[in-house]
């Protein structure tokens, strides 16, 4: 698919009040990205393990409260964190993406892998999604939610993680969101953010490169300072980065 077609489609979907449903239909019936494949589930599992490793390295607590920014359509990472043994997971997204059938697909993979018991409940057609997630999986679904003002208590969270979300956030909002993260995170807590700087349209159009700026500017672009936009506001909020600012 030409990336311009996807850009146009996403723009058109956003013009309608039911654009979210159209987008969901398109991902199920046109692009085939939903429901998530086993490969996609395994990618999410690997990503969750990477965040878990950061938590263990910089301050692990068995009963820590976890907060995810950008939980998406199927809650794969939140469910995986449940399987790690975390009893209380806050899953926030600005859009009410979550669909019961997509959550069930992840639960199915997890049962196949023996990460959760076979008798762990799925979400029925008329099931209360939020109640089942809370009661059975310890997931507090915060959708639609506002990461700038979560309503959570100060210093109530042990761990925060986010996977390929912050690159979609307007730069002027990042300091506000990070300030809220700092407020809710315990002073010895850990925040783990994975930022993907590659062009997300590369997945559907191989005629573009993962880093199109390099293709456009060629030898004239010696270095892109990728982490400055995040590290500077994070440090200003009070965070202590455990990696140096870098570039490519």
Residue ranges of predicted features:
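A short beta-strand submotif of the Rossmann-like class I SAM-dependent methyltransferase core
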Residues: 162-165
């Amino acid at each position: 698919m030409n990336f311009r077609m996807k850009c146009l489609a996403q723009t058109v979907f956003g013009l309608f009040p039911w654009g979210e449903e159209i987008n969901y239909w398109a991902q199920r019936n046109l692009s085939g990205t939903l429901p998530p494949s086993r490969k996609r589930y395994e990618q999410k599992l690997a990503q969750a393990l990477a965040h878990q490793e950061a938590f263990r390295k910089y301050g692990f607590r068995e009963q820590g409260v976890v907060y995810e920014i950008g939980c998406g359509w199927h809650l794969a990472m939140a469910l995986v964190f449940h399987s790690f043994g975390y009893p209380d997971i806050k899953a926030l997204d600005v859009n009410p993406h979550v669909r019961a059938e997509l959550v069930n697909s992840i639960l199915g993979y997890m049962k196949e892998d023996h990460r959760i018991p076979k008798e762990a409940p799925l979400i029925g057609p008329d099931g209360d999604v939020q109640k089942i997630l809370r009661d059975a999986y310890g997931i507090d679904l915060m959708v639609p939610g506002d990461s700038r003002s979560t309503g959570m208590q100060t210093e109530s969270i042990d761990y925060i993680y986010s996977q390929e979300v912050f690159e979609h956030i307007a730069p002027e909002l990042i300091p506000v969101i990070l300030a809220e993260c700092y407020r809710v995170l315990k002073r010895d807590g850990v925040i783990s953010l994975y930022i993907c700087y590659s062009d997300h349209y590369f997945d559907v159009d191989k005629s573009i490169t993962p880093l199109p700026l390099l293709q456009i500017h060629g030898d004239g672009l010696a270095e892109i300072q990728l982490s400055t936009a995040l590290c500077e506001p994070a440090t200003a909020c009070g965070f202590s980065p455990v990696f140096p600012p870098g570039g490519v």
